[in-house]
Protein backbone atom coordinates (compact mmCIF):
# COMPACT_ATOMS: atom_id res chain seq x y z
CA UNK A 1 0.00 0.00 0.00
CA UNK A 2 1.57 3.25 -1.16
CA UNK A 3 0.40 6.05 1.08
CA UNK A 4 2.53 8.70 2.81
CA UNK A 5 0.67 8.30 6.12
CA UNK A 6 1.09 4.51 6.16
CA UNK A 7 4.71 4.72 5.04
CA UNK A 8 5.63 7.20 7.77
CA UNK A 9 3.78 5.16 10.40
CA UNK A 10 5.76 2.09 9.36
CA UNK A 11 9.03 4.00 9.56
CA UNK A 12 8.17 5.14 13.08
CA UNK A 13 7.14 1.64 14.22
CA UNK A 14 10.48 0.25 13.03
CA UNK A 15 12.15 2.43 15.65
CA UNK A 16 11.73 0.59 19.01
CA UNK A 17 11.14 3.69 21.10
CA UNK A 18 10.53 2.14 24.51
CA UNK A 19 9.84 4.97 26.94
CA UNK A 20 11.72 7.27 27.35
CA UNK A 21 14.01 6.26 24.45
CA UNK A 22 12.95 8.09 21.30
CA UNK A 23 15.05 5.78 19.09
CA UNK A 24 15.22 8.32 16.26
CA UNK A 25 11.49 8.90 15.79
CA UNK A 26 11.64 12.63 16.44
CA UNK A 27 14.54 13.10 14.03
CA UNK A 28 12.34 11.58 11.33
CA UNK A 29 9.47 13.95 12.12
CA UNK A 30 11.75 16.98 12.46
CA UNK A 31 13.30 16.33 9.04
CA UNK A 32 9.86 16.39 7.42
CA UNK A 33 8.69 19.48 9.33
CA UNK A 34 11.87 21.43 8.66
CA UNK A 35 11.40 20.90 4.91
CA UNK A 36 8.08 22.74 5.03
CA UNK A 37 9.37 25.72 6.97
CA UNK A 38 8.93 24.80 10.62
CA UNK A 39 11.32 26.25 13.19
CA UNK A 40 12.51 23.46 15.51
CA UNK A 41 13.43 23.86 19.16
CA UNK A 42 14.84 20.84 20.97
CA UNK A 43 13.69 20.88 24.61
CA UNK A 44 15.30 17.83 26.20
CA UNK A 45 15.13 17.21 29.93
CA UNK A 46 17.02 14.40 31.64
CA UNK A 47 16.70 11.21 29.61
CA UNK A 48 13.73 12.52 27.63
CA UNK A 49 13.72 14.02 24.15
CA UNK A 50 11.14 16.69 23.36
CA UNK A 51 10.69 19.21 20.62
CA UNK A 52 8.57 22.28 20.03
CA UNK A 53 8.12 23.27 16.39
CA UNK A 54 6.19 26.14 14.85
CA UNK A 55 5.38 27.80 11.56
CA UNK A 56 3.71 31.18 11.15
CA UNK A 57 2.52 33.57 13.82
CA UNK A 58 -0.64 34.59 15.61
CA UNK A 59 -3.42 32.39 16.95
CA UNK A 60 -1.81 29.01 17.60
CA UNK A 61 -3.01 25.48 16.92
CA UNK A 62 -0.65 22.84 18.30
CA UNK A 63 -0.64 19.12 17.64
CA UNK A 64 0.70 17.13 20.58
CA UNK A 65 1.80 13.54 20.94
CA UNK A 66 4.41 11.07 22.11
CA UNK A 67 6.91 8.91 20.26
CA UNK A 68 7.47 6.44 23.11
CA UNK A 69 5.68 3.12 23.38
CA UNK A 70 5.09 0.52 26.07
CA UNK A 71 7.04 -2.79 26.03
CA UNK A 72 5.89 -5.39 23.53
CA UNK A 73 5.43 -8.17 26.06
CA UNK A 74 5.92 -11.76 24.88
CA UNK A 75 7.15 -11.24 21.31
CA UNK A 76 6.46 -14.90 20.48
CA UNK A 77 2.74 -14.21 20.84
CA UNK A 78 2.78 -11.54 18.14
CA UNK A 79 1.73 -12.62 14.65
CA UNK A 80 4.67 -10.56 13.42
CA UNK A 81 7.64 -9.09 15.32
CA UNK A 82 6.26 -6.00 17.10
CA UNK A 83 8.75 -3.58 15.57
CA UNK A 84 8.42 -4.96 12.04
CA UNK A 85 5.21 -3.33 10.78
CA UNK A 86 3.03 -5.45 8.55
CA UNK A 87 -0.38 -5.04 6.93
CA UNK A 88 -2.83 -7.94 7.03
CA UNK A 89 -6.42 -7.67 5.83
CA UNK A 90 -6.19 -3.90 5.88
CA UNK A 91 -4.88 -3.76 9.45
CA UNK A 92 -1.44 -2.32 10.23
CA UNK A 93 0.23 -4.30 13.03
CA UNK A 94 3.07 -3.11 15.23
CA UNK A 95 3.78 -1.68 18.67
CA UNK A 96 2.66 1.93 18.60
CA UNK A 97 0.46 1.58 15.52
CA UNK A 98 -2.52 2.94 17.45
CA UNK A 99 -0.76 4.51 20.45
CA UNK A 100 0.34 6.70 18.88
CA UNK A 101 2.66 6.54 15.90
CA UNK A 102 -0.23 6.40 13.47
CA UNK A 103 -1.49 9.71 14.81
CA UNK A 104 1.98 11.27 14.60
CA UNK A 105 2.29 10.26 10.96
CA UNK A 106 -1.19 11.61 10.21
CA UNK A 107 -0.26 14.93 11.86
CA UNK A 108 2.93 15.34 9.85
CA UNK A 109 1.35 14.43 6.52
CA UNK A 110 -1.63 16.68 7.26
CA UNK A 111 0.79 19.56 7.96
CA UNK A 112 2.65 18.90 4.70
CA UNK A 113 -0.56 18.98 2.70
CA UNK A 114 -1.87 22.02 4.57
CA UNK A 115 1.30 24.06 4.02
CA UNK A 116 1.37 23.10 0.33
CA UNK A 117 -2.15 24.49 -0.08
CA UNK A 118 -1.81 27.41 2.37
CA UNK A 119 1.84 28.54 2.28
CA UNK A 120 0.87 31.91 3.77
CA UNK A 121 -1.59 30.69 6.41
CA UNK A 122 -2.75 33.38 8.84
CA UNK A 123 -2.23 31.59 12.19
CA UNK A 124 0.59 29.61 13.75
CA UNK A 125 0.78 25.83 13.41
CA UNK A 126 2.84 24.04 16.05
CA UNK A 127 3.95 20.60 17.27
CA UNK A 128 4.71 19.54 20.85
CA UNK A 129 6.24 16.06 20.86
CA UNK A 130 7.76 14.04 23.72
CA UNK A 131 9.37 10.63 24.28
CA UNK A 132 8.10 10.33 27.87
CA UNK A 133 4.35 9.84 28.13
CA UNK A 134 3.95 6.13 28.76
CA UNK A 135 6.32 5.92 31.74
CA UNK A 136 6.94 8.57 34.40
CA UNK A 137 5.89 11.56 32.25
CA UNK A 138 8.10 13.73 34.47
CA UNK A 139 10.52 15.10 31.86
CA UNK A 140 8.18 15.30 28.91
CA UNK A 141 5.23 17.51 28.09
CA UNK A 142 4.96 18.86 31.63
CA UNK A 143 8.49 20.30 31.45
CA UNK A 144 7.98 21.72 27.96
CA UNK A 145 4.75 23.39 29.07
CA UNK A 146 6.49 24.91 32.10
CA UNK A 147 9.22 26.32 29.84
CA UNK A 148 6.71 27.70 27.33
CA UNK A 149 4.64 29.30 30.08
CA UNK A 150 7.76 30.88 31.62
CA UNK A 151 8.33 32.81 28.39
CA UNK A 152 4.63 33.56 27.83
CA UNK A 153 4.20 31.43 24.72
CA UNK A 154 0.72 31.57 23.26
CA UNK A 155 -1.27 28.38 22.79
CA UNK A 156 -4.91 28.76 21.83
CA UNK A 157 -5.86 25.30 20.62
CA UNK A 158 -4.27 21.90 21.06
CA UNK A 159 -5.20 18.60 19.47
CA UNK A 160 -3.70 15.57 21.20
CA UNK A 161 -3.48 12.50 18.98
CA UNK A 162 -4.27 9.93 21.66
CA UNK A 163 -6.38 6.99 20.41
CA UNK A 164 -9.78 8.31 21.48
CA UNK A 165 -12.00 6.29 19.15
CA UNK A 166 -13.71 3.07 20.23
CA UNK A 167 -15.18 1.40 17.14
CA UNK A 168 -14.67 3.70 14.17
CA UNK A 169 -12.35 6.67 13.88
CA UNK A 170 -13.97 9.79 15.24
CA UNK A 171 -16.82 8.14 17.13
CA UNK A 172 -15.42 9.48 20.42
CA UNK A 173 -13.61 12.75 21.06
CA UNK A 174 -12.15 13.48 24.48
CA UNK A 175 -12.83 17.11 25.38
CA UNK A 176 -11.60 16.74 28.94
CA UNK A 177 -10.17 14.29 31.45
CA UNK A 178 -10.75 13.46 35.09
CA UNK A 179 -8.15 14.34 37.68
CA UNK A 180 -5.94 11.63 39.16
CA UNK A 181 -4.88 11.58 42.82
CA UNK A 182 -3.03 8.70 44.49
CA UNK A 183 -2.72 8.12 48.23
CA UNK A 184 0.16 6.06 49.62
CA UNK A 185 -0.94 5.28 53.17
CA UNK A 186 0.94 3.42 55.91
CA UNK A 187 -0.95 2.37 59.03
CA UNK A 188 1.38 1.83 62.00
CA UNK A 189 0.93 -0.92 64.56
CA UNK A 190 3.17 -2.98 66.81
CA UNK A 191 4.71 -6.20 65.52
CA UNK A 192 4.44 -9.28 67.70
CA UNK A 193 3.70 -12.99 68.02
CA UNK A 194 0.25 -14.12 66.90
CA UNK A 195 -0.08 -16.14 70.12
CA UNK A 196 0.34 -12.97 72.19
CA UNK A 197 -1.92 -10.39 70.54
CA UNK A 198 -2.16 -8.39 73.78
CA UNK A 199 1.53 -7.56 73.35
CA UNK A 200 1.07 -6.32 69.78
CA UNK A 201 -1.17 -3.97 67.80
CA UNK A 202 -2.36 -5.39 64.48
CA UNK A 203 -2.56 -2.59 61.87
CA UNK A 204 -4.63 -4.79 59.54
CA UNK A 205 -7.34 -5.18 62.17
CA UNK A 206 -7.09 -1.49 63.01
CA UNK A 207 -7.43 -0.41 59.37
CA UNK A 208 -10.26 -2.75 58.37
CA UNK A 209 -13.14 -0.51 59.59
CA UNK A 210 -11.49 2.53 57.99
CA UNK A 211 -11.09 0.77 54.63
CA UNK A 212 -14.64 -0.57 54.80
CA UNK A 213 -15.98 2.95 55.26
CA UNK A 214 -13.62 4.43 52.65
CA UNK A 215 -14.73 2.12 49.84
CA UNK A 216 -18.41 2.79 50.62
CA UNK A 217 -18.19 6.57 50.20
CA UNK A 218 -20.12 8.21 47.36
CA UNK A 219 -17.74 11.05 46.56
CA UNK A 220 -20.04 12.82 44.13
CA UNK A 221 -22.53 12.04 41.40
CA UNK A 222 -20.60 13.60 38.56
CA UNK A 223 -22.14 16.27 36.35
CA UNK A 224 -23.14 16.90 32.75
CA UNK A 225 -19.54 16.48 31.59
CA UNK A 226 -17.93 14.03 34.02
CA UNK A 227 -18.88 10.64 35.46
CA UNK A 228 -18.95 10.28 39.24
CA UNK A 229 -15.61 10.31 41.04
CA UNK A 230 -14.26 6.80 41.59
CA UNK A 231 -11.86 5.40 44.18
CA UNK A 232 -10.04 2.10 43.78
CA UNK A 233 -7.59 0.31 46.06
CA UNK A 234 -4.62 -0.55 43.86
CA UNK A 235 -2.17 -2.18 46.28
CA UNK A 236 -2.29 -3.50 49.83
CA UNK A 237 0.62 -5.10 51.68
CA UNK A 238 1.33 -6.28 55.23
CA UNK A 239 3.13 -9.04 57.06
CA UNK A 240 6.50 -10.74 56.93
CA UNK A 241 5.37 -13.82 55.06
CA UNK A 242 5.31 -15.83 58.28
CA UNK A 243 2.06 -17.17 59.73
CA UNK A 244 3.07 -16.51 63.33
CA UNK A 245 3.97 -12.81 63.14
CA UNK A 246 1.53 -9.95 63.61
CA UNK A 247 2.61 -7.26 61.12
CA UNK A 248 3.90 -3.94 62.36
CA UNK A 249 2.67 -1.93 59.37
CA UNK A 250 0.00 -2.02 56.68
CA UNK A 251 0.58 -0.24 53.37
CA UNK A 252 -2.42 0.70 51.24
CA UNK A 253 -2.35 2.55 47.92
CA UNK A 254 -5.56 3.89 46.45
CA UNK A 255 -6.33 6.15 43.50
CA UNK A 256 -9.07 8.67 42.83
CA UNK A 257 -10.26 9.62 39.37
CA UNK A 258 -12.15 12.76 40.22
CA UNK A 259 -14.54 15.10 38.48
CA UNK A 260 -14.78 18.87 38.60
CA UNK A 261 -17.27 18.48 41.46
CA UNK A 262 -14.29 17.97 43.78
CA UNK A 263 -10.81 19.31 44.29
CA UNK A 264 -7.81 17.29 45.38
CA UNK A 265 -7.79 19.22 48.66
CA UNK A 266 -11.41 18.25 49.37
CA UNK A 267 -10.53 14.59 48.86
CA UNK A 268 -7.49 14.83 51.10
CA UNK A 269 -9.46 16.53 53.87
CA UNK A 270 -12.12 13.83 53.85
CA UNK A 271 -9.58 10.99 53.93
CA UNK A 272 -7.65 12.61 56.79
CA UNK A 273 -10.89 13.15 58.74
CA UNK A 274 -11.74 9.48 58.30
CA UNK A 275 -8.31 8.41 59.51
CA UNK A 276 -8.70 10.57 62.60
CA UNK A 277 -12.21 9.24 63.21
CA UNK A 278 -10.81 5.70 63.39
CA UNK A 279 -7.94 6.84 65.62
CA UNK A 280 -5.25 5.38 63.40
CA UNK A 281 -1.53 6.07 63.61
CA UNK A 282 -0.45 6.73 60.06
CA UNK A 283 1.84 8.42 57.59
CA UNK A 284 0.56 9.47 54.21
CA UNK A 285 2.02 10.61 50.91
CA UNK A 286 -0.18 12.10 48.19
CA UNK A 287 0.61 12.27 44.48
CA UNK A 288 -1.48 14.48 42.22
CA UNK A 289 -0.73 13.49 38.65
CA UNK A 290 -3.31 15.73 37.05
CA UNK A 291 -6.21 18.09 37.69
CA UNK A 292 -9.48 17.58 35.82
CA UNK A 293 -9.94 19.78 32.77
CA UNK A 294 -12.76 20.43 30.33
CA UNK A 295 -12.93 22.11 26.93
CA UNK A 296 -16.46 23.35 26.35
CA UNK A 297 -18.02 23.78 22.92
CA UNK A 298 -16.05 26.45 21.09
CA UNK A 299 -13.87 26.90 18.03
CA UNK A 300 -11.70 23.81 18.58
CA UNK A 301 -14.47 21.38 19.49
CA UNK A 302 -16.60 22.72 16.65
CA UNK A 303 -13.74 22.31 14.16
CA UNK A 304 -13.09 18.74 15.30
CA UNK A 305 -16.77 17.78 15.15
CA UNK A 306 -17.06 19.37 11.70
CA UNK A 307 -14.06 17.40 10.38
CA UNK A 308 -15.45 14.11 11.67
CA UNK A 309 -18.93 14.76 10.31
CA UNK A 310 -17.46 15.79 6.94
CA UNK A 311 -15.26 12.73 6.43
CA UNK A 312 -16.99 9.97 8.39
CA UNK A 313 -20.58 11.23 8.40
CA UNK A 314 -21.03 10.54 12.11
CA UNK A 315 -21.64 12.79 15.11
CA UNK A 316 -18.94 12.09 17.70
CA UNK A 317 -19.55 11.66 21.40
CA UNK A 318 -17.78 14.20 23.58
CA UNK A 319 -16.49 12.27 26.61
CA UNK A 320 -14.14 12.75 29.56
CA UNK A 321 -13.82 9.08 30.52
CA UNK A 322 -10.66 6.98 30.57
CA UNK A 323 -7.22 7.59 31.99
CA UNK A 324 -5.06 10.68 32.01
CA UNK A 325 -3.15 12.10 29.05
CA UNK A 326 -0.64 14.88 28.45
CA UNK A 327 -3.61 17.09 27.73
CA UNK A 328 -3.76 17.72 31.48
CA UNK A 329 -0.47 19.60 31.29
CA UNK A 330 -1.29 21.54 28.14
CA UNK A 331 -4.61 22.71 29.59
CA UNK A 332 -2.61 24.70 32.16
CA UNK A 333 -1.67 27.12 29.36
CA UNK A 334 -5.30 28.12 29.02
CA UNK A 335 -5.60 26.35 25.69
CA UNK A 336 -8.68 24.56 24.42
CA UNK A 337 -7.61 20.88 24.41
CA UNK A 338 -9.22 18.00 22.54
CA UNK A 339 -8.09 14.44 21.88
CA UNK A 340 -8.81 12.77 18.54
CA UNK A 341 -7.07 9.64 17.35
CA UNK A 342 -7.58 6.11 16.04
CA UNK A 343 -9.48 3.20 17.57
CA UNK A 344 -8.05 2.17 20.93
CA UNK A 345 -9.22 -1.47 21.07
CA UNK A 346 -5.70 -2.96 20.91
CA UNK A 347 -3.52 -0.34 22.61
CA UNK A 348 -0.88 -1.77 24.98
CA UNK A 349 -1.91 -5.28 23.87
CA UNK A 350 -0.22 -8.12 22.01
CA UNK A 351 -0.79 -7.61 18.27
CA UNK A 352 -1.57 -3.90 18.56
CA UNK A 353 -3.03 -2.77 15.25
CA UNK A 354 -4.94 -0.03 13.52
CA UNK A 355 -7.04 0.09 10.38
CA UNK A 356 -4.73 1.51 7.71
CA UNK A 357 -7.63 3.32 6.05
CA UNK A 358 -8.42 5.00 9.38
CA UNK A 359 -4.99 6.63 9.43
CA UNK A 360 -5.57 8.05 5.97
CA UNK A 361 -8.93 9.35 7.15
CA UNK A 362 -7.36 10.79 10.30
CA UNK A 363 -4.83 12.77 8.25
CA UNK A 364 -7.66 14.33 6.25
CA UNK A 365 -9.52 15.20 9.45
CA UNK A 366 -6.42 16.80 10.94
CA UNK A 367 -5.88 18.83 7.78
CA UNK A 368 -9.47 20.08 7.80
CA UNK A 369 -9.07 21.15 11.44
CA UNK A 370 -5.96 23.13 10.46
CA UNK A 371 -7.87 24.77 7.62
CA UNK A 372 -10.69 25.85 9.92
CA UNK A 373 -8.46 27.36 12.61
CA UNK A 374 -5.24 28.71 11.08
CA UNK A 375 -5.63 28.80 7.27
UniProtKB/Swiss-Prot annotation:
Keyword list, A-Z: Amino-acid biosynthesis, Cobalt, Diaminopimelate biosynthesis, Dipeptidase, Hydrolase, Lysine biosynthesis, Manganese, Metal-binding, Metalloprotease, Protease, Zinc
UniProt keyword annotation of Zinc present: yes
InterPro entries: ArgE/DapE_CS (IPR001261), Bact_exopeptidase_dim_dom (IPR036264), DapE_proteobac (IPR005941), Peptidase_M20 (IPR002933), Peptidase_M20_dimer (IPR011650), Peptidase_M20A (IPR050072)
A GO MF term: dipeptidase activity
Catalytic reaction equation(s): N-succinyl-(2S,6S)-2,6-diaminopimelate + H2O = (2S,6S)-2,6-diaminopimelate + succinate
Binding site for Zn(2+) 1: 66, 99, 162
Pathway: Amino-acid biosynthesis; L-lysine biosynthesis via DAP pathway; LL-2,6-diaminopimelate from (S)-tetrahydrodipicolinate (succinylase route): step 3/3
Cofactor mode of binding and number, as noted: Binds 2 divalent cations per subunit, one with high affinity and the other with lower affinity. Zn(2+) and/or Co(2+) ions are used for desuccinylase activity. The form of DapE active as a peptidase contains Zn(2+) in the high-affinity site and Mn(2+) in the low-affinity site.
GO CC terms, sorted: cytosol
Signal peptide: none
GO BP annotation list: diaminopimelate biosynthetic process; lysine biosynthetic process via diaminopimelate; proteolysis
NCBIfam families with a match to the protein in the record: dapE_proteo, PRK13009.1
Family: Belongs to the peptidase M20A family. DapE subfamily.
Assembly information from the UniProt record: Homodimer.
Annotated protein name in UniProt: Succinyl-diaminopimelate desuccinylase
Amino acid sequence: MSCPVIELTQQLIRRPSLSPDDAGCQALMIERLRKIGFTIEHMDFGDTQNFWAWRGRGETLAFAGHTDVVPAGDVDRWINPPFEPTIRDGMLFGRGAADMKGSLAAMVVAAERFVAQHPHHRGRLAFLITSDEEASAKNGTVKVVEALMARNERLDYCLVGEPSSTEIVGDVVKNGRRGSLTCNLTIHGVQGHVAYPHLADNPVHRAAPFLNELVAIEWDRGNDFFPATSMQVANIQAGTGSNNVIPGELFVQFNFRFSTELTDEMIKERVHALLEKHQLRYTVDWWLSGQPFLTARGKLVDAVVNAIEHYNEIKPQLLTTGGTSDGRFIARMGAQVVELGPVNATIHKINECVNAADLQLLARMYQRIMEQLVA
